[in-house]
């Protein structure tokens, strides 16, 4: 995206390199003048004792006494010169201290002596001694602070805003380039309409929001929406990241905030966009924030609060910000009068994903078999950035195969690349490892096909992918889901344990290949108990504090509880996992023929999908106690867990 201009301010035409070169030339001339012009001719220097000896011997004809030295001329006959010749022996000597007896000594030996008249340039060496050192210091300092600067001294620009300014419509993005977030677009269109027709609102006494905060997971299009607003509104657009306010020097952040708003007022109507606001606006003294009254971030935040609450709401300056961590922002920043409106930009649903795909495939040559609706169904949970990457990956795969257009198989492979990682055909498994992986993946597929809300098993593969996956099972939901019931959570845990259960049932031992499944199953069971309150023993009590609303993978802190409660939580989690493990073993036991047949086909072809896979998994049998377990989470009274009756496990490793 082209940058129209840097911070909009008038600067002097200051060229540090030219200035430094001129200073160097001036210094060289002064040094040459002092060393060669002002000092005059040079003569041999003798010892002061030799000078005294020569005077006593009557060899000295004339002496010139200077403040710092004595210059004397020997008699011509001492060197064999004839009288009247212009050649004479001239020497310099430096006296030892101040010799007050020297005039008397010279008179006694009939030696002429005199002091030279003051020179008209005698002041120049003194002046150079005072002027040249400061000039040298200033020149070095000027060069150091300007060597990395394109214009102006850094000391004079460090407090200026680093915001990039885009002229009217120069972002190159409009609302036609944004899809899948229709509700957010509708809200932001009001901002655009205000900038274009402000009188429509002010004549009724309405006030446009001073600030609009875009919140949502990463990659959902928050920054893209901000660019679209600037492109649609045809007004100057200031863009800066929250981290660009803070620098090494104290007070720079607050100065840059002041400078940013001064520029914005001069360019009004305009939009000021601060990306990653959480880098600047963390709660003061709160969780994830900063402490200390002199903290640079706190000073910068205070200045931002002052500027947002201080400028006239109808001058046409609208502050737009984006963050994926709204829970850590300072409450004073979110109050009405500052960020009046908060717009959630969430992951798109099926229709939104299809609309986003239509935007991103505009410049891509597509084959006739491409069905964007099917692609939208196969990409649940994908953000706008994920879908853009998906289209690009599919185009790259088609180019790698030298195709004239992108076909549906390219998109299917691209989805698997995004979800499971790259294929690693060079990783060769031995027969035992390959057989173990095959039964492991088929175990996932059979158990998952019977669980409620789990979706359809689309593909099973024993080709290694990604960092550590030796195989994978692709199971896609039939629709977008926003709520999950307790029975569906239990079914997901059982599906995760289906791979390990198949290994136990067929081989009598388990491998390390199930470690990731166990980790995910345990995490889900712990949330089942501590966050969702679905345990009958502990009741609807949340033992974890949900903090990260839009960022995944960040653990929630547990509340302070007593040791008895901790023990009860651990037991409840174990009961959930044990019940799911028992149900997975029960399902695979009564469907062992299906497990054997499907695994043999998978070992032969390495990949099973489409109709062939559906026919193999078409009629699985249900354990008699599965419905009761899914509904209540309890097994029949006195029912013994299947895993307790199996042989003791022997740990083997699969690399």
Curated annotation (Swiss-Prot):
Comment on bound cofactor: Binds 1 zinc ion per subunit.
Lumenal topological intervals: 39-124
Listed Pfam families: AAA (PF00004), AAA_lid_3 (PF17862), FtsH_ext (PF06480), Peptidase_M41 (PF01434)
PROSITE patterns named among the record's database cross-references: AAA
Any one biological process term the GO annotation gives: protein catabolic process
Cofactor(s) of this protein: Zn(2+)
Binding positions for ATP per the UniProt entry: 216-223
Membrane topology listed for this record: Multi-pass membrane protein
Keyword Iron found: no
Recorded GO MF terms: ATP binding; ATP hydrolysis activity; ATP-dependent peptidase activity; metalloendopeptidase activity; zinc ion binding
Major place of residence: membrane
Enzyme Commission no: 3.4.24.-
Record's GO cellular component terms: plasma membrane-derived thylakoid membrane
Stretches assigned to the Cytoplasmic side: 1-17, 146-655
TM helices/strands, residue ranges: 18-38, 125-145
Record: active site: 441
Keyword Chaperone: no
Subcellular location: Cellular thylakoid membrane
CDD domains from the UniProt entry: RecA-like_FtsH (cd19501)
Residue sites binding Zn(2+) per the record: 440, 444, 517
Keywords, comma-separated and alphabetical: ATP-binding, Hydrolase, Membrane, Metal-binding, Metalloprotease, Nucleotide-binding, Plasmid, Protease, Thylakoid, Transmembrane, Transmembrane helix, Zinc
Function: Acts as a processive, ATP-dependent zinc metallopeptidase for both cytoplasmic and membrane proteins. Plays a role in the quality control of integral membrane proteins.
Known partners and oligomeric status: Homohexamer.
Record family assignment: In the central section; belongs to the AAA ATPase family.
Protein name per Swiss-Prot or TrEMBL: ATP-dependent zinc metalloprotease FtsH
């Amino acid at each position: 995206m082209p940058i129209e201009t840097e911070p909009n301010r008038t600067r002097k035409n200051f060229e540090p390199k030219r200035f430094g070169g001129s200073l160097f030339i001036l210094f060289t001339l002064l040094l040459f003048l002092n060393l060669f012009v002002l000092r005059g001719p040079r003569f041999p220097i003798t010892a002061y004792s030799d000078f005294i000896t020569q005077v006593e011997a009557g060899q000295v004809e004339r002496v010139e006494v200077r403040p710092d030295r004595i210059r004397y001329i020997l008699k011509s006959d001492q060197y064999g010169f004839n009288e009247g010749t212009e050649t004479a022996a001239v020497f310099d000597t430096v006296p030892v201290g101040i010799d007050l007896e020297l005039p008397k000594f010279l008179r006694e030996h009939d030696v002429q002596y005199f002091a030279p008249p003051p020179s008209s340039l005698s002041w120049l060496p003194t002046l150079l001694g005072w002027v040249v050192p400061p000039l040298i210091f200033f020149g070095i300092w000027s060069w150091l602070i300007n060597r990395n600067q394109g214009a102006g001294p850094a000391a004079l620009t460090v407090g200026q805003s680093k915001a990039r300014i885009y002229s009217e419509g120069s972002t190159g993005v409009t609302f036609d380039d944004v899809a899948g977030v229709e509700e957010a677009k509708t809200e932001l269109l009001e901002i655009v309409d205000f900038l274009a027709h402000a009188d429509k609102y002010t004549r009724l006494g309405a006030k446009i929001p001073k600030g609009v905060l875009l919140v949502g997971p990463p990659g959902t299009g928050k920054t893209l929406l901000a660019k679209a607003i600037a492109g649609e509104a045809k007004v100057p657009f200031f863009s800066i990241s929250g981290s660009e306010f803070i620098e090494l020097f104290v007070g720079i952040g607050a100065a840059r905030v002041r400078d940013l708003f001064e520029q914005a007022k001069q360019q009004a109507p305009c939009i000021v966009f601060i990306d990653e606001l959480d880098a600047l606006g963390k709660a003061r003294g709160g969780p994830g924030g900063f402490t200390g009254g002199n903290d640079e971030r706190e000073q910068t935040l205070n200045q931002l609060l002052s500027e947002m609450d201080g400028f006239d709401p109808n001058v046409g300056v609208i502050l737009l910000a984006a963050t994926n961590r709204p829970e850590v922002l300072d409450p004073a920043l979110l109050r009405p009068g500052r960020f009046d409106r908060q717009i959630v930009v969430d992951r798109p649903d099926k229709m939104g994903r299809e609309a986003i795909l239509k935007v991103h495939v505009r410049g891509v040559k597509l084959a006739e078999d491409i069905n964007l609706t099917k692609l939208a169904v196969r990409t649940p949970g994908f953000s706008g950035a994920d879908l853009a990457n998906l289209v690009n990956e599919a185009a790259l795969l088609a180019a790698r195969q030298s195709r004239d257009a992108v076909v549906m198989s390219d998109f299917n492979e691209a989805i698997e690349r995004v979800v499971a990682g790259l294929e690693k055909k060079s990783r060769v498994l031995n027969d035992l490892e390959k057989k173990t992986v095959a039964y492991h993946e088929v175990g996932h597929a059979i158990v998952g096909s019977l669980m409620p809300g789990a979706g359809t098993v689309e593909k099973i593969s024993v080709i290694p992918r990604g960092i550590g996956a030796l195989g994978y099972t692709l199971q896609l939901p039939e629709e977008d889901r926003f709520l999950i019931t307790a029975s569906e959570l239990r079914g997901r845990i059982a599906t995760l344990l289906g791979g390990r259960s198949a290994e136990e049932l067929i081989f009598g031992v388990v491998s390390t290949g199930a470690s990731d499944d166990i980790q995910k199953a345990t995490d889900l069971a712990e949330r089942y108990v501590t966050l969702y309150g679905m345990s009958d023993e502990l009741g609807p009590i949340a033992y974890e504090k949900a903090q990260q609303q839009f960022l995944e993978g960040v653990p929630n802190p547990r509340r302070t509880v007593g040791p008895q409660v901790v023990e009860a939580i651990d037991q409840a989690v174990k009961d959930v996992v044990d019940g799911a493990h028992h149900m997975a073993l029960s399902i695979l036991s009564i469907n062992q023929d299906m497990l054997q047949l499907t695994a043999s086909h998978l070992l032969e072809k390495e990949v099973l999908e489409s109709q062939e896979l559906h026919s193999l998994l078409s009629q699985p049998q249900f354990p008699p106690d599965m419905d009761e377990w899914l509904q209540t989470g309890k097994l029949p009274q006195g029912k013994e867990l299947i895993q307790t009756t199996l042989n003791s496990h022997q740990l083997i490793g699969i690399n």
